[in-house]
Swiss-Prot record:
Organism of provenance: Cheirogaleus medius (Fat-tailed dwarf lemur)
Protein name: Cytochrome c oxidase subunit 2
Cofactor binding comment, as recorded: Binds a dinuclear copper A center per subunit.
Location within or outside the cell: Mitochondrion inner membrane
Subunit structure: Component of the cytochrome c oxidase (complex IV, CIV), a multisubunit enzyme composed of 14 subunits. The complex is composed of a catalytic core of 3 subunits MT-CO1, MT-CO2 and MT-CO3, encoded in the mitochondrial DNA, and 11 supernumerary subunits COX4I, COX5A, COX5B, COX6A, COX6B, COX6C, COX7A, COX7B, COX7C, COX8 and NDUFA4, which are encoded in the nuclear genome.
Length: 227
């Protein structure tokens, strides 16, 4: 989860988020190099007193500044496309979780099991226990197993929502009348927080998401207690 005064990403807890973090660093390095070069050229132009007025065109320079941006765009596009295809890759899921957005709460259904569904509302500040997070805790957490492929089916009952968990690199729109799909796989157990990331009305800020990722054995014990 995020920490106070944090400037970077949250710690990655899924392979997709790790790839997104690497891509961010890769792109930021390219942007930094380009910005440094531009600032260096501008400083030279402002400080030098020499001018070259006899040259009307420079074929070599024009060739370089045409090819170089194309190469830079390719260096950015290739890893971006790779991650895009990884995020859209469909594998045989071990578990399917259907998520519905409402104004202003989430409902979840474990479609592989009968009668296993519940609503998840934000815990009011007056009901928080010591150590719990304001505006991020819910009355019913989503419990999922780690290191297993989980298919998320996401839609909405009313207006646009967006189911987002930053640590897992998941952000999928919940659109009324449309069923969107996302694949979720975590590399380690823990509690991960998210929020609705699409303006959906007056209480948009009060739609937290809490995932509790546990080993398979503990997940099976939770299932037995819920069924």
């Amino acid at each position: 989860m995020a920490c106070p005064v944090q400037l970077g990403f949250q710690d990655a807890a899924s392979p997709i988020m790790e790839e997104l973090t690497y891509f961010h660093d890769h792109t930021l390095m390219i942007v930094f190099l380009i910005s440094s070069l531009v600032l260096y050229i501008i400083s030279l132009m402002l400080t030098t007193e020499l001018t070259h007025t006899s040259t009307m065109d420079a074929q070599e320079v024009e060739t370089v500044w045409t090819i170089l941006p194309a190469v830079i765009l390719i260096l950015i596009a290739l890893p971006s496309l790779r991650i895009l295809y990884m995020m859209d890759e469909i594998t045989t899921p071990s578990l399917t979780l259907k998520t519905m957005g409402h104004q202003w709460y989430w409902s979840y259904e474990y479609t592989d099991y009968e009668n296993l569904c519940f609503d998840s509302y934000m815990t009011p500040s007056s009901d928080l226990k010591p150590g719990e997070l304001r505006l991020l805790e819910v009355d019913n957490r989503v419990v999922l197993p780690t290191e297993m492929s989980i298919r998320m089916l996401i839609s909405s009952e009313d207006v646009l929502h967006s189911w987002t968990v930053p640590s897992l690199g998941v952000k999928t729109d919940a659109i009324p009348g449309r069923l969107n799909q996302a694949t979720l796989m975590t590399s380690r157990p823990g509690i991960y927080y998210g929020q609705c990331s699409e303006i959906c009305g007056a209480n948009h800020s009060f739609m937290p998401i809490v995932l509790e990722l546990v080993p398979l054995k503990h997940f099976e014990e939770w299932l037995l207690a819920m069924l």
